[in-house]
A protein has these predicted regions:
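Short, non-transmembrane alpha-helical segments in secretory-pathway proteins
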Residues: 13-75
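Cysteine-nucleophile protease catalytic domains, especially the papain-like/related folds used
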Residues: 8-40, 250, 254, 258-363
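Short, small-residue-biased leader/transition segments that mark boundaries at the very start
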Residues: 1-7
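Active-site-adjacent substructure of cysteine-protease-like catalytic cores
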Residues: 69-95, 352-414
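Acidic glycine-/aspartate-rich tracts in secreted/extracellular proteins
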Residues: 105-107, 397-398, 420-424
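Surface-exposed intrinsically disordered loops and tails
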Residues: 62-73, 220-248, 282-309, 407-408, ...
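Noncatalytic regulatory segments and standalone regulatory/sensor domains
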Residues: 14-18, 34, 75, 79-194, ...
């Protein structure tokens, strides 16, 4: 090989490094999760991932998700990509977390990172399972687009390198020429210190990332619905289904819409002047005095959760949540045995309350570029699925490389989703709004995941 230096952009380098290799080893996948967890130590969602194990494996391609590789590859053409997806459980202090990782050596990715996920049932209840489906679809869409780039660039790149280095084209490979390549399109940007764990190097783009604006991590049960038992009003206490399948007569869940609104207010309304006063909730037989209170936002946000050591403003938070529960005309959804399984708010009632307290853009299909612009302006995003509402208030842009192919760096974008179930399933998820458009246009219903949002939310 001659001594000339080839100048290449990232996509060209990727096209010649693409190789039908076997899947990444377990150790590399664990290193990827560990590196991502270590990056979090500079953010609000501090994590320490240890003792990893793979709890579930599946194979995804554009035809769907399959338990066995043979089923997956039978469903598609030879040219199509099938990626092995691993769900990795890790211990994170006293709780169990979960990471979703692609083991495809050509397209390795950490698809979602959830510091606390206690069960599959909790994934369903919080809406995280739908969000994960959207994350997998986003990953799949990006691999399809990258493979298209590989297919179009590979031969022209091989020909150029062969000509520049004066070697036969059949001798050009990533391994043979990597020491002669300089990448020119790496953008100058502020990064954190790189985290190197085993064979994975990862870093955060600080000037592109926005750490979560909403600092609370509230839930729907005790202590958040604590004021429900203090006043006599129909529907606030009932037989409620428990996690283990039993039922208790207790306060009903606060509802994800009410928790989302209350948590957004801790950010949007904390510095509002004059401050907004809320009605002190009263019982059905009490005289309606019209007395109000102004929440002490500083006290309420002293700690992420209201049951953390040193938490403050608990009564204000409980009153605010009940006030929103009443204002949103929240109702109980019951199962076959007449036990409450969730608290629901109609879209009409939600928008009426949103209009009272917030300014925002009209409901629309999720658009990643517009959501990112809102976060840059320090405004919030409320995501809406058919039966869940959750806050996006941060975005994380990372760059990773595997030491065997250190020139092939990939950027990943993660949205910080606060699902309103205390710590459960709140975390970082890949979401690409182009994925849904692409799969719908190609009539691939399996990966279509329509998600609406209210964008650019701030105090009225």
């Amino acid at each position: 090989v001659g001594s000339e230096m080839c100048i290449r952009d990232r996509d060209e380098v990727f096209s010649i490094s693409y190789d039908e290799t076997k899947d990444l080893e377990e150790k590399t996948l664990f290193n990827m999760v560990s590196a991502f967890a270590n990056l979090q130590n500079g953010t609000t969602t501090r994590s320490n991932a240890t003792s990893f194990k793979i709890v579930k494996e599946s194979f995804i391609n554009k035809e769907g998700e399959f338990k066995k590789q043979e089923q997956a590859t039978r469903a598609i053409n030879n040219d199509d990509i099938t990626s092995k997806i691993c769900e990795i459980e890790f211990s994170n202090g006293s709780s169990i977390g979960r990471a979703i990782v692609s083991a495809n050596a050509n397209f390795p990715a950490l698809i979602a990172f959830i510091p606390k996920c206690s069960s599959e049932k909790m994934m369903e209840q919080t809406g995280a399972s739908k969000l994960l489906h959207a994350s997998k679809a986003s990953y799949l869409y990006n691999t399809i687009k990258m493979k298209e780039a590989v297919d179009s660039l590979r031969l022209p790149t091989l020909e150029k390198i062969s000509k520049e280095l004066e070697i036969p084209i059949n001798e050009v490979s990533y391994e043979a020429v990597k020491n002669y390549i300089t990448i020119t399109d790496a953008e100058p940007t502020t990064r954190s210190t790189a985290v190197q764990i085993g064979d994975i190097e990862m870093q955060i783009y600080h000037d592109k990332s926005i750490f979560p604006l909403v600092k609370t991590n509230w839930g729907q049960e005790d202590p958040y619905n604590g004021w429900f038992s203090n006043i006599d009003r129909d529907g606030l206490r009932d037989w409620v289904r428990t996690q283990d399948g039993g039922k208790n007569f207790t306060s009903v869940p606060a509802g994800c819409v009410n928790i989302a609104m209350a948590q957004m207010m801790t950010y949007t309304h904390c510095n509002k002047r004059p401050p907004v006063a809320f009605l002190i909730p009263t019982g059905k037989y009490e005289v309606q005095t019209g007395m109000t209170f102004i929440p002490n936002w500083d006290q309420m946000t002293k700690t992420p959760k209201l049951d953390d050591p040193g938490a403050g403003g608990i009564i204000d938070a409980q009153r605010l949540i009940l006030d929103l529960y009443i204002e949103n005309k929240t109702t109980s959804k019951k199962d076959w045995d007449n036990a409450v399984i969730s608290s629901e708010v109609s879209e009409q009632n939600m928008l009426k309350t949103m209009n009272k307290y917030f300014k925002y853009q009209a409901k629309a299909a999720f658009n990643g570029d517009m959501a990112w612009a809102a976060l840059r302006d320090k405004h919030l995003v409320l995501m809406l699925t058919s039966d869940h509402a959750f806050i996006i208030s941060g975005i994380l842009v990372t760059e990773k490389a595997i030491s065997t192919r250190e020139l092939v760096k990939r950027n990943d974008v993660y949205w910080h989703a606060n699902l309103g179930w205390a710590d459960e399933c709140t975390g970082f998820y890949q979401l690409d709004s182009n994925a849904n458009t692409y799969f719908q246009a190609n009539a691939v219903q399996e990966w279509a995941h329509k998600m609406d949002y209210l964008n650019n939310i701030y105090a009225k």
